[in-house]
Amino acid sequence: TTPQTIFPVAWTWPTGKKITCPKTNLFLKPYKTYDNHKRIAAAQSHFRLWQMCASMNEPIMILEHDALFTKKFTAQETSAILVGAYSINDPRGATFKSKDYHNNLVDGFNKVPWVAPENIPQGLPGHSAYVITPWAAKDIIEKQDRIGWWPNDAIMCRQLCEWLYVYKPYFTK
């Protein structure tokens, strides 16, 4: 998806001032972006991949253009815990409070750590490299339809997606 090929959506993320979402009670802060169409295009790219994951009924890996592998990826066993999606990306330099994010993780699967007040959406570091299951893809599509469209890294947050994890050691940066 590019800014030229975006389709109309119910974009509810603020572009001017900070708000509290009436549907989630989460504090939403506008992103610093020159062209909001690029933010919408990125959200639509992830959305299309979530749709593909759900229709294929197979887990998929989603990689953004800037994801760089630092070692060979091996799919992690998720049957022992209820993992809907997990990041494989090193948070350092990829998200806000990235050092705190990294320092709160141990080897293996980790819930997305709290690095800010709990009313601020907190999700995968950079949202640029993750594995998602079909049931989680269906869940996030439903949430987006109900809440409205947000940037993909905000809608897929710990507060809305209890099935969100981070895997360490990381495979990408």
Regions found by a protein language model. Name each.
Residues 1-63, 67-173:
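An acidic/histidine-cluster motif and surrounding catalytic segment
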